[in-house]
Amino acid sequence: MIRNKTLIFALLVLSACGKHTREDEPQQKVYQNSQQSLFDPYIAQGSIFTREVKNMPLATNSAAIAAYMPKMPAEYLPERFKSWLVTSLNTTNYNIPVYVVNSHDPQQKYANFTSTDKRVTHKEDLVKYTIGRIPLPSYAVPAGGGDKSFAVYDRATGMMREYFHAVKDEKGTWHFSASGYFSAKPNFKDLGKDNFAMQLTTGSSAVVGMLNPLSQIGIEEARKGEIRHALSFTIANAGKGFSYPAKQGDGTSTNPNAPLEGQWFRIDPK
C-alpha cells in the first residue's frame, strides 16, 4: 500500500497569465530553459489547481469535517508519533522533489530504473514509460522519510514521470515500488487544457493518482509570498472512497465526518 495519504485543498485562487513557448521556437530554447521553474510561470495554469473556489458546492457537513480533522492524529497515529508528527511545511522530508530534465540536450545525464513490484510490472504502459534508461541528473535524491518519492519531468518530450519508494543501489540503478506518468506536450504546453483534472494516465507516486508535485509550493512562490493554485497536504487517515479529482483512495475511516482523499478545502484568508 502506498502510504502517502493526500488530500487536495484550495486557497483563494486568483488568475495569472503565463508566458508560453511557441511551437516554432528553436529546440535550443528548450535546452537553455530546462531548469526553468515549473511554478513561475505556473505550468498547470488553467487546470483544476487554479479554478475558483467560490462556485464549488459546499458539503452539508463541512463544519463537522473541519471540527473532526484536528482529532484524527490522536485516533490513527502510533503513540510514538503523536507528539511531533503534525501537518506542516516540509522542504526535505515527505514532499515530492521534482527534477526538470531535457532528453534532447546532449549533456543530459541518465539513470537506469527497474521494479519488480506488481503495481508496476502488471501495467504494460508503466513498464514502457517508467522502467529503463530515464533522464535524471546525477545529484538526484528522493525525499527524506518513508515514501522516498520524486518526480522527473522532461521538457523536451513532455513526459512527466513520478516514482514512489525509489532506492539507488551501489551501481547507480534505481529500484522503485510504484510509479505513474502523464504524457504532455513538449515544454508542458497547454497542460492545464489537456489535463484539466491533473490526473496521471496510469499509476501514482501518491495515493490519489494525480500530478501532486504541482500542488506543492515552488521556491519562486515562497520568495514572492504568493501562491495562486491549490495545495495538497497529508493527513493521518481519510474516509473510505475518494472524491474527484482523485482517481483512487486508501482511507479506512468509517466516521461520516472523515474527509475523503481528493476533497477540497478552503482556508479562511482572514
What are these regions (language model features)?
Residues 25-270:
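Short, surface-exposed polybasic-aromatic patches that bind anionic ligands, especially phosphate groups
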Residues 15-16:
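C-terminal motif of bacterial Sec signal peptides marking the signal peptidase cleavage site
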Residues 3-9:
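Sec-dependent signal peptide recognition
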